[in-house]
Each structure stands twice: as structure tokens, then as C-alpha cells.
Amino acid sequence: MKSRLLWCDILRVIATIMVISIHTISVYQYTYIKPLQLLPYSIFGVLNSLNRMAVPAFFMLTGALTLKQTKKPITRKSYTYFIKNIIYRLVIPFIIFSLAVYLLTNQHHWSVTGFLALFLNYPGVQKHMWFMYVIIMIYFFIPFLGRFVQSLSRHELKLLICLIFIFSNILSELFILSKHYHKMVFNEVALPYIIAYTNLVLLGLYFMKYNISPGKRRLIYMLGIISLILLPIIQALTNNVDVAKDLITGRSVLPVFISSAGFIFIKYHFSKVKLSSCVTKVITRLSEISFYTYLIHVTIIDIFYTYLLNHNRLNTWTDQLIWTPTQIVVVFIVSSIIAYLFDKLYRYLTKKSSALITRHQPAKQLGNSS
């Protein structure tokens, strides 16, 4: 059995909770951006910024855990095996959850064409599922990325990451802001968004592979804290929900600093943490099912949010603030339970189907001489 890095599991669980927090708090934050109501917007804005390391952290963990050192060449057999794993672990569950969410949220308008029209187009059946299209696409290139980055020195990898950040994240953000203020610059100049997210994968590898000196860690922490403060302020200055949302993606600037600070903090403060076997087991299990938790959590948020609205629990911003922690906890627990049950069922069915296929294969294919 492969040894696990507990701090990576801790980071993944924290990122999962943060994603739930983002989709819970954002509804309230953007309610007060236009017209701007400073106090409630500031409170929800700061809380939302605190969680902005979540999605970039998922990409960074992908790089940290998959771009491993290997001298083995990429063969047709090895790549086929890798693709089968992607289909089993990512694609099939993604299709199942997308179909389930579609059936739950479109109870009176079911149709195959309706589902395909959503599923085969970005961002998918629900807006948060954009992540799946990007991460699956990146995964197809992971073996090649791994071979490529092995040929780079630490300095070369750092330079590559910085260049992509400049020509993707910075130019993209300048375009977004200039467009909002009708002074358009860098239109269609920035690198495609898929490159920006791939850069987060490379950044995760860099932070995992190389030691970051205490001085540089403090600098990154400072950039993260400054970004936490600046993000809601810049969003408020735009006074536009669409622009505000564009400024918090992993292809903009400030969330990268926030996620880098969070990633490094957890790596260096939790890498030697000692927890009881029971707590470790729970964290590991929550980490293993976090992918399924991510897929279902928005549906649970919508159900609970609708319930609170119907029972007049969210009439004022103070009501919303009071109920926010409860929403996050309830959604995380319910989503995790559903994810756990799905994982058990999915493992059972795939094991049974695999055994059935093996049983019906010719003896020669199984390596038998008879």
C-alpha cells in the first residue's frame, strides 16, 4: 500500500469545506455589491476571500501528487492504463453525478437531448462543474507534463511558472478590468485559461518538490494576506457582479497568492502533525471521497437555501450571517454522507463487473496454458 501524505489529505478536506463556503457565502456577498451596502458586503467579502485558495489548491495538489519523478518511457500500454484510470475515477462518476443532478433539478423537463445539451457544453449541468472539464483535460496530459518537467532545473521551472503567470493571469486580469472601465487592453492576448490552470499544477509540483526558505515563506504569507484584503475591495470598486466573479477565478491574480500561502502554510505546519489513528482515518476517508462531495454539494446547498428562504430565516444580512456556519456544516455532512455511500456502491459495482468480465475472458487471455 502506498504511503499517504496526511497534510495533503488535510489540505484536500479543508479545500472541500472552503468550496462549500464559497458557494454558500457568494450568494449573500453579491446581493450587497450593487447597490453597494458596505458593512454586509465587507463582512461576506472577507469571509469569501478567506476561502479562495480552495479550487487552486485542488489543481496544485494534482501537480504535487501526480507529476512524480519517473524514468519509465510513456508506452501505448502504460498510457492506455492511465486513461482507463481517468475514465474509472473521474469520467464515469462525473457522468453519473451530472445525470443525477439533472434529474433532480429538472424534474418536469427531462429529455436526453436536454441533458446532452448541458453536459456536452461548458460549464456543464451546474456551474461548479466547470472544474471537471478543466481537470479531466489536464489529466490527459499529466504523463507528458511529468516527462517534460523532469528535464527542467529548479530555476527553469520557477521561470516557466512566472512567465505563464505574467502572460496568462496578469494579462487576463488587466483585460477584465480595462474592459469594465471601457479602456480595453490586451484583448485576446493572454494565454488560454487552460494554460493558467495547468500552471497551478506546475506550481503545486514546485512547492512539493523544493524546499521554500523561511524568508520566502514569510513573503508569500504577506502576499496572501494582502490579497485577502484587496480582493473584496477591488470587487466592490467594480460595482459589477460579473466582473467581481471574474476576479476570483484561478486564472486571475490574487487567488493564486492566497492559495500559494495556504498551500505552503499547511505543508510546513501539518507535515509533521501527529493525530490519533481514528482522526487520521476519518480525514483520509473524507479526502478520498472529496471528489464526489464536490460534485453533489451545490445541489445540497440549493435545497437547504430554499428551505431557509421558505421558512423566512434569511430576511436580513444578520440572519444570513448567523445561518452561514450552519449551512456550511450541514451541507458538508450531508454531501460527505452521499459521497461515502456512492463510493461504497461504485467500488462494489465496479469490482463485480470486473470479476464478471474476467470470468468470461478466454483462458489464453488470462495467461493459462490450458
Segments predicted by a language model, with ranges:
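Aromatic-anchored segments of alpha-helical transmembrane domains
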Residues: I17, S21-T24, L99, L103, ...
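Juxtamembrane "helix-exit" motif on the non-cytosolic side of transmembrane helices
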Residues: Y32, N106-S111, E173-K183, I233-A244, ...
